[in-house]
Amino acid sequence: MGTLGFLASADVSEVRETIERVLDGDYKLEKRLMLEAEIVSETDSPKKYNAVNDVCITRGVFTKITGYSIYVNDEYLATFRADGVIISTPTGSTAYNLSAGGPVLKPDIGCMAITPICAHSLHSRSIV
């Protein structure tokens, strides 16, 4: 779990008071963009996962960098070679995405960042 606490408006020293406020209905809900990832395998049935921060596709145990072609809604955007790629929501843009050199996105913006991990090129940058 992250340690910056952007989603937590209470300090750990205020846990008791915070729980009481939540039980009293004194809280605010914020809608956040989420991602759904589906892993398709030749041997297993597809598995779906939901993510609040990001989805990462990496080279795994292989020692060589991997080629990635990025499409959004069947429209080609880019091809690059890298150790992996991070698809990040605005909520997750301050986590792994930021560490990989990606942009910080406003929480209420309806987009995501696609950021290469250690791209083997000087001009492979994030796509928003």
Question: What do the predicted segments below correspond to?
Answer:
Residues 128:
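C-terminal active-site/capping subdomain that shapes the small-molecule cofactor and substrate pocket
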